[in-house]
Amino acid sequence: MRIQSIALILLALCGQAGAQQAAPPVFSLWPEGAPGAEARRAEPEKVENTYVSNIHNPSLTVVKANSRHANGAAVIVVPGGGHRMLVWNNEGMVAAKSLNRVGVTAFVLKYRLARDPGASYSIENDAAADLRRAVRWVRAHAAEYGVDPHRLGVMGFSAGGELVSLVADNPEPGLPARQDAVDKLSARPDFQVLVYPGPLGVPARSVQNAPPAFIVAGSLDKCCMPPALGLYQQLVGAGVSAELHLYAETDHAFNMGQRSERLSDVHWPDRLADWLSDSGWLIPHDGKAPLGVPSPAQ
C-alpha cells in the first residue's frame, strides 16, 4: 500500500509539472488597461478551435528557451488572422517552440483586433501600439528572462507581418500619451522576420533606419508575395541588410512549414535559423556558445 501511495504521489507531481509546462505565464502589457480599451479589458477572450478573438487586454505569453540552450536572444511572435482573430497555435505557439530549439526565448503577442466585429480599434494606432509596447515591455523585463535587450527581434505572420512592418520600417507616431517607465524605452526592434506579410505598411516610410530583415513568402500568394518582394527591394535599395525566400508552388499560410508537403516549405524554419546564426543574433556578447548548442560547422 505504501508503494502504491508513493506511486500515486509521484504521478500527481508529474501531472502538476505537465500542467505547469502547458500553461506558460501571461502578462498584460498595460496593468491598468490599454489606452482606449480600459472599459473592456475584463471581457473574456473568445477561443474557437485554436483561434482567439475579442482581445481587449493585450498581453504577452512567455515561452522560455531551455536553460541549457538559451543564448539570450529574444523574439516577439505576432500571429496573423486578418485582424479579425489570431491564429494562435500555428502562427504563435508553434513558432515560439521552433525558436526555442535554437535557444531563443519567445514572447507571443495578443494584440487588439481592428476588424473584429464590434471593435473600435485601428491597425495603425492601436494594434501597432500594442507591438511597440511589447518591444518596450520585453526590454524592461529582459533581466528577468535572461535575454539581451539589444538582441530582440519581432516576427510577424500575414496581418502580424503588417504590424512588424509598421513598427520596424515606419516612423513611430510619437511617444504614448500616457507614459510610464516602460514607455520610455526604445520600441525599435533589433531585427525583423516577416512571414508572408500583408500589404499594409508597404512601401515603408523610414527604411533607412530599419533593422535587418528576413522575409519569406510563397510565389503563388497573390496577397502577400508582392509586398514581401517590394519591401525586400526597398530595404536593399536603402542599404539595409535583408534576405528574401520565395517558395515555388506555394500559396499563403504555410505557417512554420507544418501545413505543406513541399520539403522546401517544411524546412524554411531552418533557413531562418541559418540567418539568425549568420547575423550573430544567436551568439551572446561574451562570445561563448551556450551549452548544448552545436557550432554551425558541426
Each language-model region and where it sits:
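Primarily recognizes the serine-hydrolase "nucleophile elbow" in alpha/beta-hydrolase
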Residues: A129-A210, A289-A297
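Short beta-strand/loop motif that positions the catalytic acidic residue
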Residues: I215-A217
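Active-site glycine-rich loops that stabilize anionic/oxyanionic intermediates
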Residues: P79-R84, S158, S219-D221
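C-terminal catalytic histidine-bearing segment of alpha/beta-hydrolase fold enzymes
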Residues: A238-Q298
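N-terminal signal peptide c-region/cleavage motif recognized by signal peptidases
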Residues: C14-A17
